[in-house]
Amino acid sequence: MSFNPAAGLLGKLKKLWNDTKNDYLEWERSQQGQISESVVKNHSPSKRKRRPSKEPSLSPKRRKNILNDQKKDEESIPNAGTQSQNFTHLSASKIRISDEDRIKPLVDLNQDHSFDMAYLTPASAPPPRFRFVPPKSDAKSHSAPRSLEGVTSLSDSHFNSLEANLKAISKDSNNKAHNNRYDESSLTNPEFSILVERLKSIEENLQSLQERISHCERSVSLSPSFAPPSNVKSPVQQHRSFVSSSARAKKNWGRQSNSPNSNKKTDHAYPGASMNTERGLIQNLEDSDDIHEESSDTLEEPLLINELNRTSFLNSNNNLKLNEAEENQNLLNLRSPKSSGKADNLTIKSSSNIDKVTSNDLYLDNNLQSHFKVTESQPTNLGRKEYSNSPFSIRARKDAATTSSSFESYHNTQTIQSPMKFTKATPLKDNESASVDESKVNVLSENQSLQADTATLEQLTPIPKARWNQLANKHPSLSNSAASPPVSSPGLRRSHIPVHEGLKHTRDGVAETKDALAKLREKMQERLKNHTS
């Protein structure tokens, strides 16, 4: 049987630790004026033998917490004038006042309103065993502020205790005996009013932000992020943000109903019933005053306002014929020339292919007259001196075509006579206008003209810029390379740089990279030499 010298060493260490700890606790209690008691179960430093204990044993952590609470309660009695919340842990049997503490003036607890501040006590604190009720004050000056009405359900006594406690805190903030964990959250009266004002300003800012968000949601369709880039001309942009035909019809209908000769039955009818004829619809749409009013009320984009000022469609002639709109509609249905400029014969699309029209087929060059002129052996009078691609003229012709009563039968029975030929023209001078020459235009006659189905225009929606760049790369005619200078958008920049310039940029970039690498290598070698030396 071998002898183990370490046997029982752990038990001896535990016993020594318990003895030392109990000695210290008894000395601490004797300093506080309390009766010394044995803390550890069945153990006393004076008597080493075991004895049964009636009280249940407590864990060291729980025992330490109890002692700390007692110590805090005793230390907080002389400082009762400050904002100490530790009175909620006290009872009358625990209050012990030493002789040196009797010299200090004690605060009358009936006048201290901090005990009514239930919402200022920490959440982990136990409920108070008693509460001092303050006397009711007749003065109404300490009523609750209006900003707190509806927020808390506290009585007037709570608000009186709040302001009294805040005043006591502001008075005694300079002469505090020790740090308290509630010092940081203490507020004086001006600070409280500043916080209330800040809350009001924050609520106002939130309200204004909410209004801005709703305004942005309403005007998201007019946002420039849904418009095509400036170098690409959209077939949908000229219909995108104008007032719909139903809104214009309501406006014109209200104007007719207010006239003295208007019939009372039309006031309750459909707004477009008073414009059932094609000629009346075109006259109402081409009223210049009406269009200017709607543009000033509804349009805010400067580009569209410049387009209004630039178009020659707003003239004084309001009595246009339907055949002129049909002839101009035929010009809209011509296929746009490809970017190579080699297309000579452009034919009008038949009715069977209208449903398959894509954005490339509906593309219309706004500067058509400045690049091409129409030539034919048999000239006919167009009937108008000017031709415009403005959004209003396109809308008027579209509405006239869609509201025609005999559209389907007329559309299916007509045939195409002769294609129109386009040749390259010289650029216009400053004093010339972009108008169609009457002697060089041959359009189908009134009985043989062909209307286009514009229902696909209604289904087109605004396209984002990134999608437009992809479409322009796939369809070169969308980029309008024949009319515009080289563009600066990132999606089309690569296709407009010549080959020799691209090679030159590449060579320059390689040379600069080599120089930078050589300089970097020299610097690294110098640093290495300095480091080693």
Curated annotation (Swiss-Prot):
Main location: nucleus
Region of interest called Disordered, as start-end residue ranges on this chain: 30-92, 221-274, 475-510
Keyword DNA-binding belongs to the record: no
Locations listed in the record: Nucleus
Keywords: Nucleus, Phosphoprotein
GO biological process: centromere clustering at the mitotic interphase nuclear envelope; mitotic sister chromatid segregation
Listed GO CC annotations: condensed chromosome, centromeric region; meiotic spindle pole body; mitotic spindle pole; mitotic spindle pole body; nuclear envelope; nucleus
Composition-biased stretches (Low complexity): 476-490
Biased composition regions of type Basic and acidic residues, renumbered to the chain: 498-510
Name of the protein in its database record: Uncharacterized protein C2G2.14
Source organism per UniProt: Schizosaccharomyces pombe (strain 972 / ATCC 24843)
Source species taxonomy: Eukaryota, Fungi, Dikarya, Ascomycota, Taphrinomycotina
